[in-house]
Amino acid sequence: MSYNHKNVLDTEQFSKSDLDFLIKKIKDMEHLVERHKAFGILTGKLLASLFFEASTRTRLSFEAAMERLGGRVISTVGFQFSSISKGETLYDTMKMVEAYADIAVIRHPVEGSSRIAAGAVKIPVVNAGDGAGQHPTQAILDLYTIISEKGTLDGLSVAFIGDLKYGRTIHSLINLLRHYKVRLYLISPIELALPDSYKKGLEGYPLTLEETTDIKAVWECDVAYVTRIQEERFPDHKEYERLKDLFKINKELILASKKETTILHPLPRVNELSTDVDDLPNAAYFRQARYGVVSRMTLLCLCLGQDF
């Protein structure tokens, strides 16, 4: 099949056949990187890295991906270093970026901002996180990580632990997992439960869903996806302080599981995932970060119409 998505804005845009194609192409890219490390598929192409919200991993992952493909990067980090701080609209900023770059990657604190950005320009736009909305490239690399670690998706039980209300990585990955025969366990405080809009979006798909506040439900799961409590999204800091330490994953909890539960985390972590888990063979979050580069290399090529 061919890839027909110029932009990567949310996970709803991908069908099951799109995902099957992407997983195959990411595997192909992984093999290429193992042999050559870097190559010139995107020589002469320029990526605009527009991060108006804090990021280390995602920004460096995209920039490393472009550099490994032979392309180059121009960047801006934070509102204070951009003309937006002077009152320029995102639309006008994107029109200027279009004059400089062949593709834009944008992170922005306002949900839906990537669609505004894409609507302003003809170059491809990739959403690297829009507020509490979505983070589609993280979801694609997470999906690839699960398949790489477990060999399949169908039949797996996957736990999402922590901030399911504001966690955009969770929102995005759940939208992809709905295409597979999986059992989802949503483990969170009631106050941070998955929004109803996302649960409604799962209706009619082959997965099953269970919500609980019991952290020991992770013992029933093949995969545990742990996230930090999103302090920056809370309107009331006291509420954050009350909830931040309710769910913690440590080695003792994981070793008590009946299954060899693979542990994922989009990072950064605070104190929801103990460092004593790091030396377990099923702690996959650092491998997950490595999969991110080849996943984004693949998406950059496909968005620019460059097959490999």
Curated annotation (Swiss-Prot):
Pathway: Pyrimidine metabolism; UMP biosynthesis via de novo pathway; (S)-dihydroorotate from bicarbonate: step 2/3. L-aspartate binds at K86, R168, R228. Coiled coil: none annotated. The keyword Transferase applies. Pfam families: OTCace, OTCace_N. Disulfide bonds: none annotated. It is an enzyme of class 2 (transferase). InterPro entries: Asp/Orn_carbamoyltranf_P-bd, Asp/Orn_carbamoylTrfase, Asp/Orn_carbamoylTrfase_sf, Asp_carbamoyltransf, Asp_carbamoyltransf_Asp/Orn-bd. It catalyses: carbamoyl phosphate + L-aspartate = N-carbamoyl-L-aspartate + phosphate + H(+). GO terms for molecular function: amino acid binding; aspartate carbamoyltransferase activity. Catalyzes the condensation of carbamoyl phosphate and aspartate to form carbamoyl aspartate and inorganic phosphate, the committed step in the de novo pyrimidine nucleotide biosynthesis pathway. This is Aspartate carbamoyltransferase catalytic subunit. It comes from Leptospira borgpetersenii serovar Hardjo-bovis (strain JB197).
